[in-house]
Amino acid sequence: MDESVDPVELLLRLLIRHKPHLKPYAYRQDSWQRVLDEYNRQTGSRYRQSRTLKTKFRRLKDLFSADRAQFSPSQLKLMGALLDEAPEHPRPRTKFGNESSSSLSSSSFIKSHPGPDPFQQLSSAEHPNNHSSDDEHSGSQPLPLDSITIGIPPTLHTIPMILSKDNDVGKVIKSPKINKGTNRFSETVLPPQMAAEQSWSDSNMELEICLDYLHNELEVIKKRQEDFECKVLNKLNIIEALLSQMRPPSQGDKI
C-alpha cells in the first residue's frame, strides 16, 4: 500500500468521479465495481465486494454529521461536495410523496392565510376517511426503479426508526396522511416474521463484510511476511558471502 495515499480522501474522490450513488439502478452496481477496482489498485487492498466501500461511505456520512473535527480540510471539502450532489434524505418521487408535500404546503398557506369558515375545517378534520381512497390509490403506484432494493422494502430503513420513537411520533410525522400510511405499512408489510427475516439478513450482511475485511487483512499480513522472509534470506546470503571472503585459506590451498 502506498503510504502517501489517504484512503478516505481517495474513496471520496472516486465517488465524486464515478458517482455510483447517483446512477440508476441498472448501472449502479457496475459503477461501484469500478470504484472498488480503482480503490484496490491505488491502496493495495484486496476487497472483493463493493459492499465494503458502501459501508465505509455510510459510516463517513454518519461521522460527518456527528463530529466534523475528525476530518481534514481537504476531506471536509470533498465530503461537502458529495452531500451537496446527493442529499441524505431525498424527496420521494411517488404520488404519495407529491401529495404529502402539497398537503404540507397547503397547510402552511392556510396558517398564514386563515379562511373565513373555521368550522368547515374542523368538520373536515373530524372525518379523515374522505381521503382513504386517495391514500389507497397512491399506495398502489409503482416505485421508481432506482429506489427498489431486492428483498427489502425501499422504506424499511426509515420506518422502524420512526416507529421506535414512541413519544416523538407526533413531532416527527405531522401529516395525518403520513400517519395513516405508516400505520397501515407497519401492520401489513412488517409482520413479526418479516421483522425477524430482516434482522437475520442484516446480521448476515454484517458477517459477510467482516469476513471480507478479515480476508483482506490476512492477505496483507501474508504479503508482509513473505517480504520479510525474502529480506532476511537476502541478508543471510550477503553475510555468508562476507564470511567466505574473510575465512583464512586452508593447508590444501597453500600447497
Curated annotation (Swiss-Prot):
GO terms for molecular function: sequence-specific DNA binding. Residues 128-138 have a biased composition (Basic and acidic residues). Coiled coil: none annotated. The keyword Transcription applies. Keywords: Activator, Transcription, Transcription regulation. GO terms for biological process: allantoin catabolic process; positive regulation of transcription by RNA polymerase II. Residues 87-149 are annotated as: Disordered. One of its GO terms (cellular component) is nucleus. The keyword Nuclease does not apply. Positive regulator of allophanate-induced genes in S.cerevisiae. This is Protein DAL82. The gene is DAL82.
